[in-house]
């Protein structure tokens, strides 16, 4: 903690040095006023109720990350943005391209639902989504919902939802490109085409990321081999405006990646030579929305997410504890997963005070691999209904219920209640929610050869939170705080039980529903963004978030693995002169246990980064990013590698046709 405070003071001193430059900006009032709107708190949130709703009436705990946020921080990966979000814990098992898990409010990564343009991308075999290969290219917005959201989204949303949206083309045709070079022989390059012609808008992007990277096992444990990474990503969104306010949207995202691997083990890590994982990911979605009357609208969404992942075990490995060489365990294995989804939603504006929504959802998951998991299908049909009430723009709330029917384990019913009060006089919002959730067992837990238990049912949860948002200075300053509580029942855990597991496994290990856990804690945040009317600290943005999370396995009284009690994040932005923007980010992660038995701890750490952009002309921008400024030595996962101090720089260009 002492080092954290010292580094924070250094960052404050850095910005204090820049403050005198502010006086030179007196002639830039108009330009700055135009940019003020860019960094204001987003006015509308969609994922909280599946309908556009003003932020002042949102009764869920939600955070929004915009494309502008990611651009100013020069972020390459979505996971780098999520690491700074409130109530979110992200853990990487090495460098770029290695497995990354994301958890919300103490839940597991399989209890966090991830959507890209309406398509569910959680793995059918593992349950979680691996963020390792998801870049920020062509992403417009990320909405993070904390707390159980199964009433709207079904299985996997027990902990929360991460909803990612692709950019929508607008304005005259624009062609852009970027080129970046930096530490670890990293090269990134890409191009974009976007715009709107008549009723058609489009946004296309293609990028390549190639790096020698660093060892997936931490170099402090003796690892010397670099584990390289390559990523090709393509993204497209095409929309058509239809008569009578109708709309067609088509979204596509493709990723081809190749990453070298090591044996990241808490007790016996190894450098592995020749081990790789190659994957191809496709995400497609299409939606059609059309108002039928002044009070009745509908939206139909079809989506498909597909992944093929090939694991190559390598030819030789060196144990970093004993120094012994051996042949890596395992054989080449390809896993193929597929997820299809249909959603048809109808919204009825009964009165100005009441909006009713109802919908049908169909979800199908398929999975197979070369290790004996034959093609299996999990499918579900679900219906949901929701009422949103708004009384005089002061009292508002939602109530909803959902029924899911699965082809494997039966049914699940969930519901959600929220309420809020907004005081216009003091610009204060009070909010609370209570919800239930569930998570269906994964294909591996049900059917993996010599392991799966086909008798498993769903995990279940209860979630509650209460919070307050206080605005000052015409909403340019916001203070928030709240408490949350989650209770998980029937958690699926892998156990050693020769008698129980005998029908399923000769290894005597199998999944059972024996787990119960709870998480609780409190959150606090502060954000400030300048407005065009005020001169004090003009050009400064500041965000700080703190989360305190107490987790407990109710069967063993142990803390849940890899969840810190305390974590902080901070983002400070400043524009000393009109063409320049500087951002400093820092995050602190408290000590935590690496395993369920709480017999191995990971120490606390804080990591700081610096990003700067400079507009050379209206068409050309240069940028710089420095990561791990203070060369912190830490591990997110026991023995996993992390980057040392590293620097990256690049140039962006964009040329638009005359309107």
Indicate residue ranges for each PLM-predicted region:
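Extracytoplasmic beta-strand/coil segments of soluble accessory domains associated
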Residues: 79-123, 140
């Amino acid at each position: 903690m002492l080092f954290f405070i010292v580094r924070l003071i250094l960052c404050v001193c850095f910005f204090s040095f820049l403050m005198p430059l502010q006086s030179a900006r007196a002639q830039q009032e108009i330009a700055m006023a135009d940019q003020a709107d860019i960094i204001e708190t987003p006015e509308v949130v969609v994922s909280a109720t599946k309908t556009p709703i003003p932020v002042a009436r949102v009764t869920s705990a939600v955070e929004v990350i915009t494309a502008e946020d990611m651009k100013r921080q020069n972020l390459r990966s979505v996971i780098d943005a999520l690491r700074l979000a409130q109530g979110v814990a992200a853990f990487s098992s090495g460098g770029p391209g290695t497995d990354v898990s994301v958890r919300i409010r103490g839940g597991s990564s399989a209890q966090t639902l991830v959507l890209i343009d309406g398509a569910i991308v959680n793995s059918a075999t593992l349950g979680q989504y691996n963020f390792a290969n998801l870049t920020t290219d062509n992403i417009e917005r990320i909405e993070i919902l904390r707390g159980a959201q199964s009433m709207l989204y079904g299985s996997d949303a027990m902990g929360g939802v991460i909803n990612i949206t692709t950019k929508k083309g607008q304005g005259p045709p624009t062609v852009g490109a970027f080129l970046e070079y930096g530490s670890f022989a990293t090269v990134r390059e890409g191009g974009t085409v976007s715009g709107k012609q008549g009723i058609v808008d489009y946004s296309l992007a293609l990028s390549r990321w190639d790096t020698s990277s660093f060892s997936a096992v931490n170099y402090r444990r003796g690892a010397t081999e670099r584990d390289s990474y390559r990523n090709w990503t393509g993204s497209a969104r095409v929309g058509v405006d239809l008569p009578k306010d109708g709309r067609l949207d088509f979204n596509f995202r493709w990723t081809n990646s190749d990453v070298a691997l090591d044996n990241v083990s808490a007790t016996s890590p190894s450098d592995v030579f020749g081990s790789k994982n190659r994957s191809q990911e496709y995400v497609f979605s299409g939606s059609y929305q059309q108002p039928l009357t002044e009070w009745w609208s509908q939206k139909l969404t079809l989506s498909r997410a597909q992944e093929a992942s090939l694991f190559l075990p390598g030819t030789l490995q060196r144990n970093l504890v004993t120094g012994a060489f051996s042949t890596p365990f395992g054989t080449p294995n390809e896993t193929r997963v597929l997820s299809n989804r249909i959603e048809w939603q109808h919204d009825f504006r009964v009165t100005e005070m009441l909006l009713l929504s109802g919908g049908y959802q169909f979800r199908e998951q398929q999975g197979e691999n070369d290790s004996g998991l034959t093609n299996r299908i999990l499918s579900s049909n679900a219906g949901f209904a929701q009422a949103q009430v708004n009384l005089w723009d002061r009292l508002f709330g939602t109530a909803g219920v959902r029924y899911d029917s699965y082809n494997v384990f039966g049914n699940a019913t969930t519901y959600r209640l929220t309420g809020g009060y907004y005081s216009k006089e003091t610009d204060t919002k009070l909010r609370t929610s209570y919800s239930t959730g569930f998570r269906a067992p994964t294909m591996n837990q049900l059917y993996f050869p010599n392991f799966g238990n086909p008798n498993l049912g769903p995990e279940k949860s209860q979630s509650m939170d209460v919070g307050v948002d206080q605005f000052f200075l015409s909403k340019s300053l916001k203070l928030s705080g709240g408490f949350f509580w989650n209770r998980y029942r029937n958690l699926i855990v892998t156990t050693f039980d020769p008698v129980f597991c005998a029908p399923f496994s000769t290894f005597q290990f199998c999944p059972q529903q024996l787990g119960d856990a709870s998480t609780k804690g409190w959150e606090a945040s502060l954000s400030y963004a300048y407005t065009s009317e005020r001169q004090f600290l003009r050009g400064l943005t500041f965000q700080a978030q703190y989360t305190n999370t107490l987790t407990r396995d109710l069967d063993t009284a142990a803390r849940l693995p890899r969840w810190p009690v305390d974590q902080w994040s901070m983002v400070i932005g400043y524009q000393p002169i009109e063409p320049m923007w500087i951002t400093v980010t820092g995050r602190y992660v408290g000590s935590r246990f690496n395993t369920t038995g709480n017999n191995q701890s990971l120490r606390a750490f804080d990591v700081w980064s610096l990003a700067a952009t400079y507009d050379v002309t209206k068409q050309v921008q240069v940028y710089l990013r420095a990561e791990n400024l203070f060369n912190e030595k830490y591990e997110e996962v026991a023995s996993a590698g992390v980057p040392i101090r590293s620097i990256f720089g690049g140039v962006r260009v964009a040329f638009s046709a005359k309107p």
